[in-house]
Amino acid sequence: MKDTVSQPAGGRGATAPRPADAASPSCGSSPSADSVSVVLAGGGTAGHVEPAMAVADALVALDPRVRITALGTLRGLETRLVPQRGYHLELITAVPMPRKPGGDLARLPSRVWRAVREARDVLDDVDADVVVGFGGYVALPAYLAARGLPLPPRRRRRIPVVIHEANARAGLANRVGAHTADRVLSAVPDSGLRRAEVVGVPVRASIAALDRAVLRAEARAHFGFPDDARVLLVFGGSQGAVSLNRAVSGAAADLAAAGVCVLHAHGPQNVLELRRRAQGDPPYVAVPYLDRMELAYAAADLVICRAGAMTVAEVSAVGLPAIYVPLPIGNGEQRLNALPVVNAGGGMVVADAALTPELVARQVAGLLTDPARLAAMTAAAARVGHRDAAGQVARAALAVATGAGARTTT
């Protein structure tokens, strides 16, 4: 088995050990007569890469013979995340969409076709049976290549495409690709993609299979919380969130007075200013990041977090009530991501500008001292969460790959 990164121009390979809890994949470069070759096109941010890796693990669990190739670019997190998960990565030219007229816009067509040619070479090299796309810079070239482009110098076979959209508002690549895709899957009903089947967002197996009640005692001991504690979990993504850090740390005294323990991942570049803990105060555990999110989720009773698609998917999948604080940029995508859970009663949305220490103290203390309301929110979050999204996407990919039958030529 070879877990490598291949650059567009034939760069050096890179290897990484595979996590112990992940299935053993088949490398994309070892074809066999009866194995299915799947190309996963999802790069750039963790929101694109993590669902792809969850689907990769689900594919291997369904069919250990499957050959998986991840498609990415040099500028994305996939150069680190994919080899860490033990999968083969092929790199193509990144084609970001220019935000304003200029030289980048004039060069866009040539960059697109270069990326399409590179993607097509990868599809041919691994004898791809299906492309599963997750949006982002790498997806559109993969979709076009799968359609049989570019045509010269020889006629190309068409490769089936399955699209997954994690966000409540579909991005450009998936909007374009959905017109000709064989299957279109989405996280929520109103993504804007025609023919979309709602499956949720694929999450890691360690999260999808998490039984918080079973793991709670171990998780709380791990972080130093009493078994009967009321625990607030706070995180703002891999880099933390300054506004969440300020609001929650500013409420530390009030939270302690209410008997609330805090597990706060503040980000590796951030420092929390916390008051000196008084004797008898509940623990306030501040860490740069959490590398065992399943333990963090199991320890918690309530979460304050951003509302990225992956965050909402994981928090709802494990049935945690949440106070979602959408990132105040873009077109409100994060707020839309949280709305299905909020509308079902599994959480609430607080605007970033409205998140103050006073609000944190009032809302958190109110929720954690109201067992009936917290239990209702927990049940609502669990009903909305999708634990088998990765399996559903994987099964769709295998069905399309094997059920498409004869490969058509365009």
Curated annotation (Swiss-Prot):
Binding of UDP-N-acetyl-alpha-D-glucosamine, residues: 45-47, 167, 204, 238, 334
Subcellular location field: Cell membrane
Topology relative to the membrane: Peripheral membrane protein
InterPro entries attached to this UniProt entry: GlcNAc_MurG (IPR006009), Glyco_trans_28_C (IPR007235), GlycoTrans_28_N (IPR004276)
GO BP annotation list: carbohydrate metabolic process; cell division; cell wall organization; lipid glycosylation; peptidoglycan biosynthetic process; regulation of cell shape
Predominant localisation class: membrane
Keywords, ordered alphabetically: Cell cycle, Cell division, Cell membrane, Cell shape, Cell wall biogenesis/degradation, Glycosyltransferase, Membrane, Peptidoglycan synthesis, Transferase
A single cellular component GO annotation: plasma membrane
Additional observations: Was identified as a high-confidence drug target.
Name of the protein in its database record: UDP-N-acetylglucosamine--N-acetylmuramyl-(pentapeptide) pyrophosphoryl-undecaprenol N-acetylglucosamine transferase
